[in-house]
Amino acid sequence: MIYGTGIDIIECARIQKVMERDIGFRDKIFTEGEIAYCETKNRNKYQHYAARFSAKEALMKAIGTGWRFGIRFADIDIYHDELGQPHIRLTGKAKELADKEGFSKIHVSLSHVKV
């Protein structure tokens, strides 16, 4: 059963501008694993940060609660398996909500344009 569908899009340049202006934004929004992954992308890192930001926003739209209930962006971890397929791992309040609502499988697709 599909619990919900969420879609989000953001301009990569917007994420780049915010991150260059406020280093705390990165640490508040992204997990250590996401930061490590994106930082390996050198010239294209902001594209990868933007894709993860949008995936987190899309997930919250799919759940239908918005950012209430104390869920933090960093409670949502976007990672890749050994084949490069993206997945979502929930922790903290996001996991509590998922467990309460009874959804365990989350599908995600990431897209971005070159900056």
Give the label of every model feature segment.
Residues M1-V115:
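Core catalytic alpha/beta fold that binds nucleotide/phospho-ligands
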